């Protein structure tokens, strides 16, 4: 078992040390996250960013390759020139991470390019669009966890899973 609460609680319930409760419905007024899988498309990315900014929200752009984050920032700046963009990843020192997160929370940034550092523990209710670049490099449970960073209020949330153009999307 890990140190996370779910396995510990499950172990306690199965061992009869604790009762098991089930949550079968989402919180009242909670909407399902609309998830789209797409190849990189400047128009789709621009539209998703502009829709969120126009309604006063913010965006996570997950890009798990720290070496190329600055080139992604440049590319996003060209797609949406008025965007205020921050960068957060685990190779920053703690003070820099905290500084960048505070700027994002205080709405100095419209979008933050980040690594999977956001996977757990963040609950910023104003962030309701997440774009996950190169989603094929993540596991399914990791994608689900990262996607869960949005949609934490009654506001409609969107998740865009970006795959490289060289892969084909088959219809189900």
Would you name each region that the model predicts?
Residues 1-172:
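Inter-lobe coupling/hinge segments of SF2-like helicase ATPases
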């Amino acid at each position: 078992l890990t140190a996370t609460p779910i396995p510990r609680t499950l172990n306690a319930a199965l061992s009869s040390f604790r009762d098991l409760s089930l949550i079968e419905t989402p919180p009242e007024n909670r909407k399902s996250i609309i998830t789209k899988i797409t190849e990189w498309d400047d128009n789709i990315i621009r539209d998703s960013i502009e829709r969120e900014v126009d309604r006063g929200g913010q965006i996570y752009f997950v890009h798990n390759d720290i070496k190329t984050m600055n080139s992604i920032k440049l590319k996003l700046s060209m797609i949406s020139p008025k965007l205020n963009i921050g960068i957060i990843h685990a190779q920053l020192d703690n003070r820099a991470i905290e500084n960048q997160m505070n700027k994002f929370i205080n709405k100095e940034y419209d979008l933050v390019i980040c690594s999977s550092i956001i996977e757990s523990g963040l609950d910023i209710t104003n962030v309701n669009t997440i774009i996950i670049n190169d989603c094929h490099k993540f596991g399914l449970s990791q994608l689900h966890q990262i996607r869960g960073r949005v949609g934490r209020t009654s506001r409609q949330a969107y998740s865009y899973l970006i795959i490289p153009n060289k892969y084909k999307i088959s219809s189900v």
